[in-house]
């Protein structure tokens, strides 16, 4: 049920990413992992494997199911990136967040039902935002 953008598909198999020092060093699983590996390899650029940014969805009106309800060529799948409680994991360029990595390959991977901790403080548990009240925007 996780989503890989720009592929605009719901994953139906487990894909395991090995990450060391901020870079993907291995992609394991079945067909979907092979598809992801080949897509990233095509760019022939080690920077495509770099982690660019992370975040989590806060929009209660965004729907995880929205991508399946529209033509694949319509829109940018913003619901997939924003639905409440997702963990958004991204690879590739990071210049928009102050980094220096430039590469044409960018993946956004919204993950469902994750547990996210920052400095040992729970932020998302099983897809529910539990960040401390003082850290939430008003």
What are these regions (language model features)?
Residues 1-138:
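Metal/cofactor-centered catalytic core regions of large enzymes
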């Amino acid at each position: 049920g996780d989503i890989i953008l720009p592929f605009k598909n719901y994953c139906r198999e487990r894909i395991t990413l090995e990450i060391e020092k901020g870079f993907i060093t291995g992609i394991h699983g079945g067909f979907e992992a092979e598809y992801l590996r080949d897509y990233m390899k095509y760019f022939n650029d080690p920077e495509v494997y770099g982690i660019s940014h992370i975040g989590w969805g806060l929009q209660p009106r965004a729907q995880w199911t929205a991508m399946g309800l529209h033509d694949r060529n319509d829109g940018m799948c913003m619901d997939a990136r924003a639905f409440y409680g997702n963990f958004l994991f991204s690879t590739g360029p990071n210049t928009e967040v102050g980094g220096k990595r430039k590469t044409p390959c960018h993946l956004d991977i919204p993950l469902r039902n994750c547990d996210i901790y920052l400095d040992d403080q729970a932020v998302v548990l099983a897809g529910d935002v539990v960040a401390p009240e003082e850290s939430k925007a008003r």
